[in-house]
Regions:
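Divalent metal-binding acidic/histidine catalytic loops
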Residues: 1-279
Length: 279
């Protein structure tokens, strides 16, 4: 999209019925492109997709901008590196361990497929890593936040996600926890599927988040949260820690790879972060 453009502030004329149909068709084409690997347009597409019911001329122009970008940069390759990431275990040693969390979440246990449905392990075990982020109150009209996360198997990007949150959150802390819960749900499903395919998994999924409060509340049993719908996300993440599904650690915002899926960044920052897993 054009630099500085905010789709929610666009007040250009609304499209007619034919224009709406055309807009929806173009969105569908771009979604297909994202599904097969054009992750560099995911954030912009996510923002514009929310206006499919009543798009404006300005929204259509931005769709054309995206197609122009794809024409000028027709190739983007994702790295699929089978080697394990070089992650220092000491990053995940702060806070309470899994056994301590078990004191509160006694029934926490990772769901595993039935033994008769699991084939013999194939190949060597893999590790899974996730980066999660949220752009708090990113929408200038509704003040809804935006969730973004990515999941890796070893060093291979396997899942990418960018979507506006369903609720309006009063704090960055709440929006980040809701993003973390969404990420945990995808992690749980991925781990189940890998086992169904006969792929052994090395320990818990390592999750990186750039919000220190979220990391502290995910790794220290003594923390509490009372806001109802936020506390659901809060306990879901902590339950996953107790079940051994995830381990959570802090990462500097500058190196949070999920940052590109929550908001529009400068060209330099985009290129640096995308350069970690694309070429």
């Amino acid at each position: 999209m054009a630099q500085g453009y905010q789709p929610e502030l666009d007040m250009s004329p609304e499209l007619d019925e034919n224009g709406i149909t055309s807009f929806q068709e173009l969105i569908g084409i771009l979604r297909w492109a994202v599904e097969i690997g054009r992750v560099d347009i995911l954030t912009e597409l996510s923002m514009l997709s929310t206006y499919q019911a009543c798009p404006r001329q300005g929204h259509m122009e931005q769709i054309h901008h995206i197609f122009s970008y794809l024409k000028n940069k027709p190739k983007l390759t994702l790295y699929f590196d089978p080697s394990e990431p070089n992650i220092d275990p000491i990053w995940f040693q702060s806070g309470d361990n899994q056994d301590t969390f078990k004191e509160q979440y006694r029934e926490a246990k990772e769901e595993l497929p039935p033994d008769h449905m699991v084939p013999e392990p194939l190949g060597r075990p893999v590790s899974t890593t996730a980066y999660v982020d949220a752009s708090h109150a990113a929408n200038k009209v509704t003040r809804r936040s935006h969730t973004g996360f990515i999941l890796f198997i070893n060093k291979s990007l396997i899942i990418w996600y960018s979507k506006r949150q369903n609720t309006v959150e009063a704090s960055t802390f709440s929006s980040e926890f809701i993003a973390a819960k969404c990420c945990v749900e995808h992690i749980t499903a991925l781990r189940f599927k890998l086992r169904m395919f006969g792929v052994p998994i090395i320990e818990s999924t390592k999750v990186f988040c750039d919000n220190q409060s979220v990391v502290n509340n995910s790794t220290k049993l003594s923390s509490t949260l009372n806001k109802k719908h936020s506390s659901i996300a809060y306990h879901a993440v902590r339950w996953a820690v107790a079940a051994g599904i995830i381990k959570v650690a802090w990462i500097d915002t500058a190196w949070n790879l999920a940052d590109v899926f929550t908001k529009r960044l400068t060209v330099e920052t985009r290129n640096r972060l995308f350069g970690e897993w694309t070429y």
